[in-house]
Amino acid sequence: MMCKALVFAVLLLAVPLERADSRALRTPVDAIQFVEQFLEHYNDLLNIDDLENQTGDQLESPQPLSSGLKVAEYPKWVDVPSQNDNTWFRLLRGALANRKRALPDRAKRGWNRGCFGLKLDRIGSLSGLGC
């Protein structure tokens, strides 16, 4: 994903714009220097492969709890905090946990329409002639 963003940034900077007041880099040398500086600055970011390797390592080797808290103090659906969690890993895991849950079936079906549809059901309930 980061590679796609880098390719897009390089293509965006390399294509000269027709407008005179644009901020596009004028020469390919400037564009190459900019991309090199960009890569040097963001080279140390965590990528997807590192995240997968880190999650695989944590699943393979269980670590003892050093925080003094017992496992019984936590419900089964809550992860026990470990001290060596990477900040990126915690951030991504929290983002996945905070996703909206699936919509209930009622939201997918719409209003309860009853026997004869919504309008006729309201008329029937007022007059006592429901189904």
Curated annotation (Swiss-Prot):
Highly expressed in brain and liver, and moderately in gut, gills and heart. Expressed to a low level in atrium, ventricle and liver of fresh water eels. Coiled coil: none annotated. The keyword DNA-binding does not apply. One of its GO terms (cellular component) is extracellular region. One of its GO terms (biological process) is cGMP biosynthetic process. Disulfide bonds join 115-131. Keywords: Cleavage on pair of basic residues, Disulfide bond, Hormone, Secreted, Signal, Vasoactive. InterPro entries: C_natriurtcpep, Natr_peptide, Natr_peptide_CS. It comes from the Eukaryota. The keyword Disulfide bond applies. It is found in: Secreted. Residues 1-20 form the signal peptide. Residues 21-109 form a propeptide. PROSITE patterns: NATRIURETIC_PEPTIDE. GO terms for molecular function: hormone activity. Belongs to the natriuretic peptide family. Hormone which plays a role in endochondral ossification through regulation of cartilaginous growth plate chondrocytes proliferation and differentiation. May also be vasoactive and natriuretic. May be important for freshwater adaptation. This is C-type natriuretic peptide. It comes from Anguilla japonica.
